[in-house]
Each structure stands twice: as structure tokens, then as C-alpha cells.
From Swiss-Prot:
Gene designation per UniProt: ZNF215
Subcellular location as annotated: Nucleus
Species whose genome carries this gene: Pongo abelii (Sumatran orangutan)
Domain SCAN box, chain residue ranges per copy: 48-126
Described function: May be involved in transcriptional regulation.
Annotated KRAB domain residues: 164-237
One Gene Ontology MF term: RNA polymerase II cis-regulatory region sequence-specific DNA binding
Protein name: Zinc finger protein 215
Pfam families for the chain: KRAB, SCAN, zf-C2H2
InterPro entries: C2H2-ZF_domain (IPR050752), KRAB (IPR001909), KRAB_dom_sf (IPR036051), SCAN_dom (IPR003309), SCAN_sf (IPR038269), Znf_C2H2_sf (IPR036236), Znf_C2H2_type (IPR013087)
Length: 517
């Protein structure tokens, strides 16, 4: 191994003569043979270059590209003759040399280290020697003093900088470009923009904390938030147009709501950002929502009976609808039902005001609430929750849950849960009595045929006057009497043959159909 003092005599690689460069390459090949004696280095470098500089455009598809890369890697590393340790050592040495500065890489080749540990020891010795001699890095031939700086290139140093604005990180689209994006890309754009804004907001807070109190006081007086779009109709207040100095807060609200960028159905206006600031951990300015109408009282807008809370578009219009009188200054009320219209106004000593949505009800819901004053069901069943407008209806309904049957038939002892059912039952008893007392066999109507077996007690109430045969249905008695009278009311239209039953006529007509076929 060459002495360390020889390092100072080595110039940059681009200043080496052709003979010296060839000497470096020859020494490099000899060093590889000494490091891994088992490896055959005749075509190792050529195979490595083919593997490292392989291009995808030279093949027809991904499968062929992967296959060729695998083949080139096998030709370079030769796993059939090299051990895993040798292959790993070769890969580590290659990568370590690649990350070194160019002048250091050339010098390391000339030293012929046996392994990666020797290479690290060489570099540490050179750095220590240069620091001891106090040699300036700029004047030295190999410029070894810059090694530490290049190793620490990723570490942030220097004085703190001013926080960047949203303009520095925003990605802009034209109207045509935005229209061609699908919903997934638009959602991704939204997430990235909100994430950038959250990061910028945190940087802004840290920057403000480092400023003196007086400068913060002056800056707070000059700030104005830029809000270009109008708040949707469903919001409570009319937003004031506020212009002023551009800030990161104002830029994101302006950027994300102007036409050509995320449309109203995606962002739902500025109101969408304010409703979601807790979800995204961002703090948007509240100055833009200072109401034009100020209330001196902090009393809630309420309806005194059912204690419901509404979100309204216009307090005065709702009170006019509910009470039919113009609203007065102060806290509007519906004195009949005490419906609350809730505001939280706290502008004393603060730069912003807050309001909260209690229920997302529209104006139509408020009108329906007024109509419900006259149709409210105030009698509710405690078991199933069903409500009724009359107490008598609730009492009848509760009989279903208790299973109570308070109405009893005095003749047969049967119970019913409703008086109407008992009345119908008693009418059947009266009809049965009239039928049994009149033994004339006269057929009664179908509703009086006594289909309820509990009333009949097994007796047939329809008796034939000719033969004394009885039936439990009037229709059966009528069909039976046709036998005695010889009546045949069912006549065939083709052959004029008559039958006393419709079923016999149907069978006869099937014979005609069979003969025709």
C-alpha cells in the first residue's frame, strides 16, 4: 500500500496523463484480483457495464426486459462459482466507490485496498492528516478537505429562513386541464393542497412566535383575508368582501375556490374548508364571517315548549312565519314553542367571530315545524313509541300490549278486546235464534249462513221441506232443491243439453272440445 504522503502528489483525474490513467485502470484490475482471488475478472467489468447501462427501449416488453436483466446480472456476478459473501462484498465496494468524490475514487483505486474496511481506514487517515497539517482544501491537489462537506450535504445548516408562501408550492391547472381530470385525481389534488397548507400554517405559527410582541401587534392590524367567492345561501350571514395583503391563508382560500380549480361540488365553497378544518388540523381565518347585523344580547333564539334548535337562513323571516309579526331587535323567539335559533357572537377583544350549526335544517323544515303545531301527536305509547292525537286511541292501542279482553258475550262467555267485535258477535247470536225458531228451511243470505262453528254447536240450520235433509249452508240447500224440482239451469250452447250443476256442464263441454280436436 502506498504511503499517505503520496496523496498530496496526486492531481485531479482530468489532469492525469494518458499513461497515468492506464496505470490507474491496470491497478484497479489488479486490486480486484487481490480482493476476490476466486473471481475471474477477464470479462467481469464488461458484464457489469452491460448490466448497469441496460436500456428498456432495446426490448419489446417488460417480461423480456426482466429476463435480459437477470441474464446480465448472472454473467456479471457468476453465482455458480462465487459465494454469497464474495458477491455481497463486490456489490458493496462498487456502491461505496460510486458515492465517493471523483478525485477520492481515483486515489482509492491506486492504493489497492483489500476490502471495504481497508478503504474506510484509508479515507479516515487522509482526513485526519489534512486536519493536523491545517492544509486548505481549496489549494490541495486532490481537495480532500471537501470530503466532510460532501458527506454532510444533506444536513440543514445556516440561519433560519422566512417561511414560504402557498404560491411557492401550489400546483396550478387551467380550466381545460382541470376538466380532463377524473375524480380520483381531483381528490388527490385536494389532499395535497390541504397538506401543504397545513405545513405552511405550522411554519407560519413558528415564525410568528419568534417575532417581538410589538411587531405582531402591528402586523395583526394590517392583515386582511382574501375571500373572492360568495358564501352559499345556506350560511347564516352575508360575507363581507375583504381585501388586503396576501398571506398563505388567503392564498389557499382564493386558489382553491376560483373557477377552473376544484368546482363547487367538490369543495362546496369556502364553507367546506371551514367545516373540515378540524379534520385536517388547519386553522383558517374567521374574519371573513363577521356578520353585518350585530346583536347586543347573547340570548338564544328559542322556542319555549319543545326546545328545538334550528339552523336558519334569516332569523326575521322565520319569526315572521311562526308568529306573523315583524322581528324586533334582540333575540327573536317563537313564544309558542320556544324554538331556539342559536348564535355564538363573541367579537369583544377578538379578531374573529364564531357561529355554529346546530341542526342542518332548511327553511322548508322550519315551515313544517310551524305546521306541526296544530297536528302534533301528544299521546305516546311508552312501550312501542307510537303516538296518537287522542287519549282514547292510546287506551285502545295499549290493550294490544296487555292482551286484555274486557268485553264479554253474555250468552257464550267469549271475550273480545273491542266493543265493535262484541256487537258483531251478538248479532250472529240473534240471527241463529231467529233461524232455529223458524223451521221453514228458508235460505238466508251468505252473511247469515253462520260460518262461525262456535255459534252452531254442530247443528245444520238449513233443512229441505221436501225430504227433511238439513245443510249448514244455504247454497247447499239450493243445489239440493233442484233435485226435487227437476230444474236444470245450466245449458250447453252447442247441443242444448241442460244440467243441474255447473260442474257437470264443464265436463260436458270438454267432450265437445275433444271431438273438435
Amino acid at each position: 500500500m502506498q504511503p499517505l504522503s503520496k496523496l498530496m502528489a496526486i492531481s485531479k483525474p482530468q489532469n492525469l496523463s494518458l499513461h497515468e490513467q492506464r496505470e490507474v485502470l491496470r491497478a484497479d484490475m489488479c486490486w480486484q484480483q487481490e480482493t476476490i482471488p476466486v473471481m475471474e475478472t477477464h470479462d467481469s467489468e464488461a458484464s457489469r457495464q452491460k448490466f448497469r447501462h441496460f436500456q428498456y427501449l432495446k426490448v419489446s416488453g417488460p417480461h423480456e426486459a426482466l429476463s435480459q436483466l437477470r441474464e446480465l446480472c448472472l454473467q456479471w456476478l457468476r453465482p455458480e462459482i462465487h459465494t454469497k459473501k464474495q458477491i455481497i462484498e463486490q456489490l458493496v465496494l462498487e456502491q461505496f466507490l460510486a458515492i465517493l468524490p471523483e478525485e477520492v475514487r481515483t486515489w482509492v483505486h491506486l492504493q489497492h485496498p483489500n476490502n471495504s474496511e481497508d478503504m474506510v481506514t484509508l479515507i479516515e487517515d487522509v482526513i485526519e492528516m489534512l486536519e493536523d497539517e491545517g492544509m486548505p482544501c481549496k489549494d490541495s491537489a486532490p481537495q480532500m478537505g471537501s470530503i466532510k462537506e460532501k458527506m454532510k450535504a444533506g444536513s440543514p445548516t445556516g440561519k433560519p429562513q422566512e417561511p414560504v408562501t402557498f404560491k411557492d408550492v401550489v400546483v396550478e391547472f387551467s380550466k381545460e386541464e382541470w376538466g380532463q381530470l377524473d375524480s380520483a385525481v381531483k381528490n388527490l389534488y385536494r389532499n395535497v393542497m390541504l397538506e401543504n397548507f397545513r405545513n405552511l400554517n405550522s411554519l407560519r405559527k413558528a415564525h410568528l412566535l419568534s417575532k417581538p410582541f410589538e411587531s405582531l401587534k402591528l402586523e395583526s392590524r394590517k392583515k386582511r383575508w382574501i375571500m373572492e367567492k360568495e358564501i352559499p345561501r345556506k350560511t347564516i350571514f352575508d360575507m363581507k368582501s375583504i381585501s388586503g395583503e396576501e398571506s398563505s391563508h388567503g392564498v389557499i382560500v382564493t386558489r382553491l375556490t376560483e373557477s377552473g380549480h376544484p368546482s363547487s361540488d367538490v369543495w362546496k365553497g369556502e364553507n367546506w374548508l371551514y367545516r373540515n378544518q378540524k379534520k385536517w388540523d388547519i386553522n383558517l381565518p374567521q374574519e371573513a364571517f363577521i356578520p353585518e347585523t350585530s346583536y347586543t344580547d347573547e340570548e338564544d333564539f328559542e322556542c319555549s315548549e319543545n326546545k328545538e334548535t334550528f339552523d336558519i337562513n334569516s332569523v326575521s323571516s322565520i319569526c315572521a312565519i311562526q308568529q306573523g309579526i315583524p322581528s324586533r331587535k334582540g333575540s327573536p323567539k317563537c313564544d309558542k314553542f320556544k324554538t331556539q335559533f342559536k348564535f355564538n357572537l363573541d367579537s369583544v377583544g377578538k379578531q374573529h367571530s364564531e357561529y355554529e350549526y346546530v341542526n342542518d335544517l332548511s327553511l322548508r323544515t322550519d315551515i313544517r315545524h310551524q305546521k306541526s303545531h296544530t297536528t302534533m301527536n301528544s299521546y305516546e305509547c311508552y312501550q312501542c313509541g307510537k303516538a296518537f292525537c287522542r287519549s282514547s286511541s292510546l287506551i285502545r292501542h295499549q290493550i294490544i300490549h296487555t292482551g286484555e279482553k274486557p268485553y264479554k258475550c253474555s250468552e257464550c262467555g267469549r271475550f273480545f278486546n273491542r266493543r265493535t267485535n262484541l256487537t258483531k258477535h251478538q248479532k250472529l247470536h240473534a240471527e241463529v235464534k231467529a233461524c232455529t225458531s223458524n223451521k221453514c228451511g228458508k235460505a238466508v243470505s251468505k252473511s247469515e249462513d253462520g260460518n262461525n262453528p262456535a255459534l252452531h254447536f254442530g247443528n245444520n240450520f238449513y233443512e229441505c221441506v221436501n225430504c227433511g235433509k238439513s245443510f249448514n249452508r244455504s247454497s247447499s240447500l239450493i243445489r239440493h232443491q233442484m233435485i226435487h224440482t227437476g230444474e236444470k239451469p245450466f245449458k250447453c250452447k252447442e247441443c242444448n243439453k241442460a244440467f243441474n250443476r255447473s260442474s257437470n256442464l264443464v265436463k260436458h263441454q270438454k267432450l265437445h272440445t275433444r271431438d273438435k280436436s
